[in-house]
From Swiss-Prot:
Entry-listed glycosylation sites: N28, N77, N86, N237
Annotated organism of origin: Bombyx mori cytoplasmic polyhedrosis virus
Protein name: Polyhedrin
Keywords, ordered alphabetically: Glycoprotein, Host cytoplasm, Late protein, Signal, Viral occlusion body
Function: Major component of the virus occlusion bodies, which are large proteinaceous structures (polyhedra), that protect the virus from the outside environment for extended periods until they are ingested by insect larvae.
Other observations noted: The sequence of strain H is shown.
Length: 248
């Protein structure tokens, strides 16, 4: 396994194992009717903030993505310490806290949710008041032109999840995201079936290549899937996990 700059194999594998253990714990302890939503926020310094929310029959998210400096204060320079793992803050551009840009701004957000979620509203706000214009969001969705509101994630012809991805205007230094939905059929839904978030991960092969004049220091090359069904980002041509095209 090649090193990401400033990150040893041992550090990376240790973080991978902790994440995998946590996911397996959550997955194995899931109850019927679970609803899963994963939110990825991509920052201008290369940081990725990942938030997962599970609930019974309904899901409600109200998260504010702020400059990551608030999470870094008082922390050690260890690239992937337990605090960061627990807070779901990762530095795929090297992991060195000294490389962190205090003026980091969210540049894009991706939402992946299971088909058991009937999403009613997705609202964005600048600060706590101004909403992102609908026409801007429509321009940000490469699949909007086809009339599909969300990109469908399929496995063996069956829809196993949906992806909602958009970039943010350059002046946004914080973003509030609210997602609400209800379970479509709680009486028959079974997390042990193909309709679970682990299968969603195994099925998504998203091209997240973007770079504009406001954010020229990072390019997300591809979305990779690990053998353990945890999605990794291929940053600056450092590949981890297994691309779907190479899966057996």
């Amino acid at each position: 396994m090649a090193d990401v700059a400033g990150t040893s194999n041992r550090d990376f594998r240790g973080r991978e194992q902790r994440l995998f253990n946590s996911e397996q714990y959550n997955y194995n302890n899931s109850l019927n009717g679970e609803v899963s939503v994963w939110v990825y926020a991509y920052y201008s310094d290369g940081s990725v903030l990942v938030i997962n929310k599970n609930s019974q029959y309904k899901v409600g998210i109200s998260e504010t993505f702020k400059a990551l400096k608030e999470y870094r204060e008082g922390q050690h320079n260890d690239s992937y310490d337990e605090y960061e793992v627990n807070q779901s803050i990762y530095y795929p551009n090297g992991g060195d806290a000294r490389k962190f840009h205090s003026n980091a701004k969210p540049r894009a957000i991706q939402i992946i949710f299971s088909p058991s979620v009937n999403v009613r509203t997705i609202k964005m706000a600048k600060g706590n008041a101004v909403s992102v214009p609908d026409e801007y969001l429509q321009r940000s969705h490469p699949w909007e032109a086809t009339g599909i509101k969300y990109r469908k994630i399929k496995r063996d012809g069956e829809i196993v999840g949906y992806s909602h991805y958009f970039e943010l205007p350059h002046e946004y230094n914080s973003i509030s995201l609210a997602v609400s939905g209800v379970h479509k059929n709680p009486s028959s839904y079974n997390v042990g079936s193909a309709h679970n978030v682990m299968d969603v991960f195994q099925s998504c092969d998203l091209a997240l290549r973007f770079c504009n004049r406001y954010w020229a220091e990072l390019e997300l090359v591809n979305h990779y899937i690990s053998p353990n069904a945890y999605p990794y980002l291929d940053i600056n041509n450092h590949s981890y996990g297994v691309a779907l095209s190479n899966r057996q």
